[in-house]
Amino acid sequence: FDRDTLLPKIKILFEKLKYGGINDIKIVNPSWQEGVSKNITFIVTKDCQLACKYCYLVGKNEKERMPWETAKAAIDYVLDREDDPNFAYESVIWDFIGGEPFLEIDLIDKICDYIKTEMYRRNHHWFNSYRFSFSTNGINYDSEKVQKFIKKNHEHLSIGITIDGTARKHDLNRVYKNSERGSYKDVVR
């Protein structure tokens, strides 16, 4: 059917329903939010080992990092609003990006411990329905601290490692700071 044919038929149907005694017609659709998670994003640092040629981050490779007090205040703000419709989601994804987030693994570990403790203490409905998500260049993935964090949180963890395709393609854009050396071999090791 085209629009010109269908629209008059729909109007006739609604008129028949209305005159048949149905005055409150509602089209019921399942909520688009059903099964959707609330995303809370922490930019824990602007620092990175790389100087990717297409990086979107303004002021990239600055040593700026998120203070613990800022992270704690943000967590408290979010968890205090459990009854707010803007936070009425079945689950939550606590997302960590940068720069390179794993450069701040100690801060991230402290943030995640606080989130888990507070959700438990408050009996928050997200306590058994959360994930920690990371977008990383993968260079620090094998570090002892990162691996310890992964083991501790593995049941609630998603990690995306950015690779641009083949080694040649990756190394064209994803180079170390102050160098043209590509990072592919360090990521896939």
Annotated model-derived regions:
Residues G59, E100-P101, G138-I139:
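Acidic metal-phosphate-binding loop of nucleotide-sugar-dependent transferases
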Residues D2-T41, P85-A88:
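N-terminal [4Fe-4S]-dependent radical SAM core
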Residues E34-G35, N39-T70:
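Canonical Radical SAM [4Fe-4S] cluster-binding loop centered on the CxxxCxxC motif
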Residues L79-D95, E104-R189:
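Radical SAM/AdoMet-radical enzyme domain recognition
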Residues K72-I75, C112:
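Hydrophobic core segments within long, regular secondary-structure runs in both alpha-
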Residues V44, Y56-L57, G99, I161-T166:
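Short loop/turn segments at strand-loop or loop-helix junctions that form parts
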Residues K63-M66, E100, N178-S179:
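Pocket-edge positions in alpha/beta enzyme catalytic cores
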